[in-house]
Amino acid sequence: MEITFLPLILLGAAVLLLAIFFYYVPFLLWISAKVSGVNISLIQLFLMRIRKVPPYIITRAMIEAHKAGIKTLTRDELEAHYLAGGHVEKVVHALVSASKANIDLPFQMATAIDLAGRDVFEAVQMSVNPKVIDTPPVTAVAKDGIQLIAKARVTVRANIKQLVGGAGEETILARVGEGIVSSIGSSESHKTVLENPDSISKLVLRKGLDAGTAFEILSIDIADIDIGKNIGAFLQMDQAQADKNIAQAKAEERRAMAVALEQEMKAKAQEARAKVIEAEAEVPKAMADAFRTGNLGVMDYYKMKNIEADTSMREAIAKPTGAPSKPLKD
């Protein structure tokens, strides 16, 4: 008995052709669209496959928009947004949420926000339900030198019209932190801040920190304030240590100058003593010349020796016991 594979081959070919047909012509998806009231033809679904646009995404988005009462949304707009690299599902979700919340969100604005890299659906949700952002600990010093560490909670609402080109959460946090530092730094005492923490939030809110951002600040609440270090005392200690080092350096400089002056005076004294000794050495020569010339007699010489002896005796009496006496000159 011969076994023929022709029926199996034909069956396989038929299954393959049907698979290809239903891939390029999603008949079940077309039926789903018709049942939902969306006007779309099989040819349009086929052309989507040719243009490499997933018919399922476009059709499901049109069904969702139609059921939500958004009648102005067209297939060409959704296809164009998909081909531009946008997220069709998120855009339609955002349009539906905005419509239910009575938020004015045109399709062009929604697609622009999506193509700008922002989550348009999350933005609509933030417009309906404001988001609370916790700031990191902000450290500031009051005028009395006490350090304070504050934490704040910022309640923001998305500003849909500023989502394209507006600053993000990082800018909000940076501005709030700057405002907290400025408010604490302008306080005369840290006790004032601890007694009235709401003064910080009021001052920060008055500055309009949400200008140019994609958010609208609804409230700023100080969640916690801790006392840090006494920065003023540390600065005073550092200044005192610096003054001490400067004073020690100046004292050392004066001591060195005094030592140098003392050594200089000793050198001058030695020089003067040497001159005296040199002058004393000339006395015998002068006396000899005086004897030769007759200007000095023998009696004058002995009278001078007596005067020297009396002077030496008086010096010996005036000196304390044990001090060496000056020897008499011959």
UniProtKB/Swiss-Prot annotation:
Chief localisation class: membrane
Membrane topology: Multi-pass membrane protein
Pfam families reported for this sequence: FloA (PF12127)
Assembly description: Homooligomerizes.
The protein's role, per its UniProt record: Found in functional membrane microdomains (FMM) that may be equivalent to eukaryotic membrane rafts. FMMs are highly dynamic and increase in number as cells age. Flotillins are thought to be important factors in membrane fluidity.
HAMAP family noted in UniProt: FloA
Descriptive protein name: Flotillin-like protein FloA
Originating organism: Parabacteroides distasonis (strain ATCC 8503 / DSM 20701 / CIP 104284 / JCM 5825 / NCTC 11152)
